C-alpha cells in the first residue's frame, strides 16, 4: 500500500482508499513522494516523504461534520508550510481544513524548533538593565521637579491675581458684582426673584 502508481488516481482493491501522486514543480526538494489517503470513514491522511525525513498530517472528521483538531507533524517549517498550502481534498464540502488547524500545526512546529535558553537570558538581562535605567532616570527627574515646586505664598499670589482678573472681566461683561452679590448699572438690568 506504500507504493505509488504512476497513474493520477488509483483505486485499491477491496477498499475505498484512494492514493494520488502529486506533481511537484520544485526540483530543489529532490522530488518527494506525496500521497493522499481517504476512506469512507471520513478520515484524511496526508504524508510527504523523501530520503531526508518523513512528514505527515492526519485529520479526522467526526460524525457531526466538525473536524477534530488532531494534527501530528514531524516537518520542518518549509515542509509544514508546503503541506498547509498544497493539501488536496477529493471532496471539498466533506473535508475542509480550518485556518485554526493550520496555525496550530505551524505553531507546534515552531515550538519544537525553539530558541536556546542562553539567547533568551541575554536578551532579558539587556532589557532589564534598560528598564532599570529608565526607571532611575524618571525618579531623578521627578525629584528635580519636586525641588523646583513653588511655595505656598507663590501659589496664593498666582491664584489671587487670576481671581481678580476673572472678577473684573465678569463685572465688565454682565454689570454684576459677584463678590458683594449686587447688580451694577450697565447694559443688563437685574431683577431679583423671590421664591
Curated annotation (Swiss-Prot):
The keyword tRNA-binding does not apply. Pfam families: CDI (PF02234). Ubiquitinated by SCF(FBL17). Ubiquitination leads to its subsequent degradation, thus controlling cell cycle progression. Expressed in flowers, in developing pollen, and at lower levels in roots and leaves. Residues 37-50, 68-80 have a biased composition (Low complexity). Coiled coil: none annotated. It comes from the Eukaryota. Binds and inhibits CYCD2-1/CDKA-1 complex kinase activity. May target specifically CDKA-1. This is Cyclin-dependent kinase inhibitor 7. The lineage of its organism: Eukaryota, Viridiplantae, Streptophyta, Embryophyta, Tracheophyta.
Amino acid at each position: 500500500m506504500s507504493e505509488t502508481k504512476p497513474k493520477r488516481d488509483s483505486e485499491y482493491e477491496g477498499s475505498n482508499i484512494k492514493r494520488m501522486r502529486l506533481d511537484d514543480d520544485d526540483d530543489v526538494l529532490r522530488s518527494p513522494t506525496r500521497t493522499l489517503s481517504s476512506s469512507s470513514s471520513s478520515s484524511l491522511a496526508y504524508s510527504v516523504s523523501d530520503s531526508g525525513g518523513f512528514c505527515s498530517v492526519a485529520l479526522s472528521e467526526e460524525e457531526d461534520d466538525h473536524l477534530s483538531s488532531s494534527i501530528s507533524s514531524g516537518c520542518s517549517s518549509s515542509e509544514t508550510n508546503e503541506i498547509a498550502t498544497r493539501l488536496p481534498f477529493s471532496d471539498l464540502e466533506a473535508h475542509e481544513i480550518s485556518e485554526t488547524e493550520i496555525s496550530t500545526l505551524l505553531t507546534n512546529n515552531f515550538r519544537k524548533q525553539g530558541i536556546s535558553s542562553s539567547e533568551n537570558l541575554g536578551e532579558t538581562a539587556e532589557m532589564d538593565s534598560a528598564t532599570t535605567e529608565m526607571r532611575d532616570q524618571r525618579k531623578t527627574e521627578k525629584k528635580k521637579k519636586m525641588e523646583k515646586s513653588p511655595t505656598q505664598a507663590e501659589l496664593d499670589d498666582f491664584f489671587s491675581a487670576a481671581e481678580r482678573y476673572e472678577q473684573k472681566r465678569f463685572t465688565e461683561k454682565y454689570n454684576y458684582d459677584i463678590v458683594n452679590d449686587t447688580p451694577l448699572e450697565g447694559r443688563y438690568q437685574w431683577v431679583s426673584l423671590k421664591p
